Regions:
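Short, structured secondary-structure elements
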Residues: 1-191
Length: 191
């Protein structure tokens, strides 16, 4: 914890110096109830319950805030909240898209992403499984489910489509998503 404090002090001092340079003063410390509300919304997307607020207000230990952080990180709602942005980036949808927008159950992939966040899966493993889980030696069911990242694109099920044209569209969509997710840039202009 001493290292955490030194790290925090380093950042606090940097921020304070910049505020002084701009002739600004830091915001006052929020009250405990506000801190818990902010923390809960940030980590789970949900406001704290009255019981959680009462427990936090009664906890006068020096690490009361840290205990709340740990509690919220253990909540299944943490994975749900953290998965939202990734699922958006991965184009997650329980439908095929286009005009004939039929149901496509992608819930196993969604549940896998939520579980990966809740288990604190290392980022390299999280990415590796999604891109090539099926190509790893002795892939598990979880690894295979993770590769649904590569199948989240729209699929046209309309009659009379030109199959080859849409195969190309699917590849372009996956390539664009890869660029957005892993390169931090759009590659759509290369189409």
């Amino acid at each position: 914890r001493k290292q955490d404090q030194e790290f925090s002090d380093l950042h606090d001092n940097f921020i304070l110096k910049k505020l002084e340079e701009e002739k600004l003063s830091p915001a006052k410390m929020a009250d405990k109830e506000t801190l818990l509300r902010r923390l809960s919304l940030d980590l789970t997307g949900l406001p704290p319950t009255l019981a959680e607020i009462d427990a936090f207000l009664k906890d006068n230990s020096p690490n009361a805030y840290e205990k709340q952080v740990d509690r919220l990180l253990k909540s299944p709602h943490y994975g749900e909240k953290m998965a939202v942005d990734w699922l958006d980036l991965a184009r997650f949808a329980d439908s095929h898209g286009y005009t004939v927008d039929r149901l496509r159950d992608m819930s196993p992939y969604r549940d896998w992403v939520i579980g990966a966040f809740n288990k604190n899966m290392p980022y390299d493993k999280f990415i590796h499984w999604q891109l090539a889980g099926d190509l790893m030696s002795q892939p598990t069911k979880e690894m295979l489910i993770a590769t649904a990242f590569n199948r989240n694109h729209q699929q046209n099920l309309e009659g009379g489509i030109i199959e080859e044209e849409f195969q190309t569209e699917y590849v372009v969509d996956r390539t664009n998503t890869f660029g957005d997710a892993f390169l931090g840039l759009s590659v759509g202009c290369a189409k």
